Amino acid sequence: MSERPALALLAAFLLASCAPSAPVASGTTQRNAWTEPGHLRIGSSEEPDSLNPMYANDQAAGDVANLLYEPLFRYDQNGEFVPAAATVVPTLANGGISRDGKTITFHFRHGMRWSDGAPYDGRDFVFTWHAVMNPHNSVRLQIGWDDVRAMQLRDPYTVVVRLKAINAGILGDLAGIGGSGYPPIPAHLLATLPSLDRAPFNAAPISSGPFVLTKWNHGASLEFAPNPYYWRGAPGLQQISYRIIPNSETLLSEIRTHEIDVYDSVSENQIGELKTLSGVTISKHLSANWRRLQFNCAKPQLSDPRVRLAIAEGVDWDWMLRTIFHGYDERAASDVVPTSWAAPPIKPWPYDPDAAKRLLDAAGWTVGADGMRAKNGMPLAFSVSTTPAKQANVQAEVQMQQQLRTLGIALEIKNYPTNLLFAHDGPIYTGRYDSEFTIETNGPDPDNEGAWSERFIPPVGANTSWLRDPIITQTSHAALLTYDRAKRRALYWREEARIHQLVPAVFFYWQNQYAAVNSDLRGWRPATYFSDLWNAWEWRI
């Protein structure tokens, strides 16, 4: 056989292999040929850094927590509380919150069990509070939990929480999942341990949620099966494979070849191609995820707000959003979700390199013969760090580097894998970084005290900007001391105006979350807050 006919036959074979498979009949309906009934395959660019939510930092850990744990309340797709392990959401109106706002009563469902058959009830909730506050446990955050004066176990199904002061955002901290909200962990397994930092549970937990972990193939996948004791009954899936695929191009390839059924948080440059795929549905929603260039304000070259504002005005953020990020997201001006009742009337800093140069001149940073700025012998140079899994992140860093150089600022790119960047002993939480170009996520309540107050600088909190400002510290705290939304809104507007003035971060965009899912998947209802896996027990395929 000559070479040309052989190549022609090979080409015909490859074309046939790559062609979309025809739907397969299943009873009275049709399903895609690649669908594995009852088995959902999720692709993730990250691997959980811990399966104990108290120690977890990344989005993958938040996803998996929604499979493994049943919090007192879940957030629905609109950010509203939905009773889960608790039977009702406490309010002033229903008496669950006392008139003085300092006592909250939680009622647990009867008959709930952990996946090992042990009872799951208020005792686990009380133990969880003690675990969060245990000084031997290096938990991620204590925000909200440290406002509790005492917890009283009235009976196994009733817990009375007494607060040191009113905290309007505390329900999300104590009873939600995500942010500083930790679901209860099992007292019967963990209460005798002096510290949970190295507990085997952190990598091999039992479950109170709809699924149990059957195997963790580190670096490859986490496998889940239904929890036989889940209080809602058997979930609709028989198996979930949560596959670790760090590269966005590989994720695209695997949804294209139908080796995965869900590709969440799609990279912006891939959305157009994904919309052309047969048997794949694209969902879109505004998420509570926001990208920022956050500064370490404790660094001497970044301690002056004029320098930080010059960086904000010296980079064409709108151009980057339109081009590098393909215009799929919404420009940000603050860290309050645009749809929130507390969203402030603030506009982003404009692109104005001439104004940026004037600010740097006024701050005493002079231009040398090489065109770069220095002050008292110290060069105006800093580094930026991101997670390089998404190509657009690195492209944006390069663009910042080029534009800041025209102002006389040297920017070094120093990137890390997610698990290193956000580790407790990693660069961000130890302050060994200059700036971070990363995604942060919000809860439904606009409380952001833990992000900006000097009371919550690590290791006691998550103010990783190291910003110290009495107005922000006082105002963010005062906003938690009332349940009156009008008063809270006024306080948050004042706080956000101050943040805008001091520029501890350049707020870049609010993420429109895109997901590519197998069109056979039923029950997929992506959420604004925390995780799209919030209702996994409802899924069918």
What annotation goes with each model-predicted range?
Residues 41, 121-128, 156-162, 166, ...:
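Alpha-helical secondary-structure segments
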Residues 43-97, 130, 204-208:
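N-terminal lobe/hinge region of extracytoplasmic solute-binding protein
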Residues 76-80, 177-235, 239, 249, ...:
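Gly/Pro-rich hinge or "lid" segments in bacterial periplasmic/extracellular proteins
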